[in-house]
Amino acid sequence: GSEMCIRDSACTMAELKACTQAGATCGGCVPLATQVMKAEMARRGMAVNNHVCEHFPHSRQELYHLVRVGGIKTFDELLHRHGKGLGCDVCKPLAASILASCWNEFVLQPQLASLQDSNDYYLGNIQKDGSYSVVPRMPGGEVTPDGLIAVGQVAKKYGLYTKLTGGARVDLFGARVEQLPLIWEELIAAGFESGHAYGKSLRTVKSCVGSTWCRYGVDDSVGLAVQLENRYKGLRAPHKIKFGVSGCTRECAEAQGKDVGVIATDKGWNLYVCGNGGMKPRHAELIASDLSKDRLLQLIDRFLMFYVRTADRLQRTSTWRENLEGGLDYLKDVVVNDSLGLGAELEAQMQHVVDTYQCEWKTAVTTPEVRQRFRSFINSDQPDEHIVFVQERGQIRPARSEERSEALV
């Protein structure tokens, strides 16, 4: 199919999508389809480039370098100095991600808000019916009884569907856009922060109970998981990042299937990187052994910022690693042995991200001009009447089309 389409001049992902419908539903096959398309183009002797879109004759890595070295703080400045045209729905979110990775400014401030995709624009994951999910951060999967009660009370008050996520936290579904600030105000008052479930950023640090409770535990995996999550929360990257910390080799936190995995040993911590448990599972690889906590944090700082600096748009660490020239040995040299002399620079860049962290939802609900954008209609305060729920297994779910028709009659 791709050969026929390329023969018929389909030389961009948008054209291939229109021709074959590849990537037109969930988008999961887009990276593979892009790879096939470029391989076929190269086989036919056609010019192949890694430009992000028609507005920037640069790869993501080159754009990151231009932003970082040039001290560029806005999309308009980036476009004026290094691009052309007005931008599009590919380069705008990409630029927003790079700007956030470099400078970590509030994503909904005026010059950045218009660049965000629909999830980042409303600081929530939009669902199939137009409602949003709410995911408060629970570092290391740890939550107090009072915290659980507060989440339950908020869910009950606003009639939300509750489910435990794979990342060991509570997901609340069914919030209308105008309810989001009210819900988050109550969660923040109860001590919660944004879980960044909507962002291409650090998601969760999964952990077992470790040596604190488990008779097999070798070290305090929960304590380390909480420390890691609080250090890297808010970091924007080319794609989402997941961690796991296990207190012994029984590996209950599945750290070897995560972007960053840490396993306790009797001499310290083993660090694994570039694992993935998604559509194409990949076993994480051991990059360093028996590390002290300080050395572990140093290597994770370097690894994450090197990934942020060099990966392609929407590329997970596993795919990035597969495409990295020199493979694991090269990655070890750069991160562990500091072969490029970038260590101190990468660590300083990460420290800036850590030092400038803010809970995006706390800033949003306390900034009137940001808060007022959370409504269904620009010229009305009325809620969206097309968001309809029905009861199932004691909770709400989105109404199907025939059920919605009956409810709206």
Describe each PLM feature range:
Residues 1-6:
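Short, small-residue-biased leader/transition segments that mark boundaries at the very start
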Residues 7-37, 45-53, 57-95:
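Compact, charge-rich alpha-helical regulatory domains located at protein termini
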Residues 24, 28-45, 85-110, 178-179, ...:
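Terminal amphipathic helices with adjacent charged low-complexity linkers/tails
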Residues 247, 251, 256-318, 330:
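Mobile "lid/hinge" segments at catalytic clefts and subdomain interfaces of large enzymes
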